[in-house]
C-alpha cells in the first residue's frame, strides 16, 4: 500500500505561482460552480496546496470571504461620470441591472453578503449609488433612505429570480418599470 504524500506550502514550479489574486480567482470560479463560498480545504485542494498556505495571504477565513465578495462587487457597473448629470436614471438602471446580474451569476452571493459582518462589499455599491445621485443634490438622510430602499428591493428581486420555476416570469429587464417609479420619487424628494 502506498501513501500519497501531501503537498505542503506554496506550489513549486514556474507554472504554479500562488498569490492572493490566484486564490481569489479560483474561489470565485468555485463559487460560481457550487453556488456557495468554497471551504478553505476545498479551495486548497483545487489549488493543489496545503490549506495553511492560504493563510499566508489572508489572515483568516473572514478576511478571505471579505476579499472574495468585495472583488465580486467591484465588477458591477461603474457609473460614467461624464453622463451622470443628464442620464442619472439610466446610470442607476445600469448599476441595478449589473448588481442583479452578479447576484444571478453567483447564486450563493446574496446570502453570503447578507450574513457578513463586514461592510466592505456594501460600501462599493453605496459609493457608486451616491455618485449616480449627485445631480439630485439630496440630503444625506434621503440618500441613505433611497439606498436602503433600492438595496432591499434589489435583494428581494434577486431572491425572486433565484426561486422561480423553469419557465421564468421575471427577468432582469422587468425592473425597468419599478425603477422609473423609484426615480420619479427621487426627483420629487
Regions found by a protein language model. Name each.
Residues 1-7, 163-189:
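C-terminal peripheral helix-coil segments that are non-catalytic and often amphipathic
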Residues 69, 97-127, 159-163:
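Amphipathic alpha-helical segments used for helix-helix packing
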Amino acid at each position: 500500500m502506498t501513501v500519497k504524500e501531501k503537498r505542503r506550502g506554496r506550489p513549486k514550479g514556474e507554472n504554479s505561482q500562488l498569490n492572493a489574486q490566484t486564490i481569489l480567482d479560483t474561489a470565485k470560479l468555485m463559487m460560481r460552480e457550487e453556488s456557495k463560498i468554497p471551504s478553505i480545504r476545498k479551495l486548497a485542494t483545487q489549488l493543489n496546496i496545503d490549506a495553511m498556505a492560504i493563510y499566508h495571504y489572508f489572515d483568516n477565513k473572514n478576511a478571505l470571504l471579505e476579499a472574495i465578495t468585495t472583488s465580486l462587487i467591484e465588477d458591477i457597473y461603474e457609473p460614467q461620470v461624464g453622463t451622470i448629470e443628464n442620464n442619472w436614471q439610466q446610470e442607476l438602471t445600469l448599476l441595478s441591472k449589473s448588481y442583479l446580474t452578479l447576484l444571478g451569476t453567483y447564486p450563493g452571493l446574496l446570502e453570503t453578503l447578507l450574513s457578513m459582518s463586514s461592510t466592505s462589499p456594501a460600501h462599493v455599491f453605496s459609493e457608486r449609488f451616491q455618485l449616480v445621485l449627485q445631480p439630485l443634490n439630496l440630503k444625506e438622510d434621503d440618500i441613505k433612505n433611497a439606498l436602503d430602499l433600492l438595496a432591499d428591493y434589489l435583494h428581494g428581486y434577486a431572491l425572486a429570480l433565484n426561486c422561480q420555476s423553469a419557465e421564468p416570469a421575471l427577468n432582469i429587464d422587468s425592473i425597468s418599470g419599478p425603477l422609473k417609479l423609484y426615480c420619479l420619487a427621487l426627483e420629487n424628494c
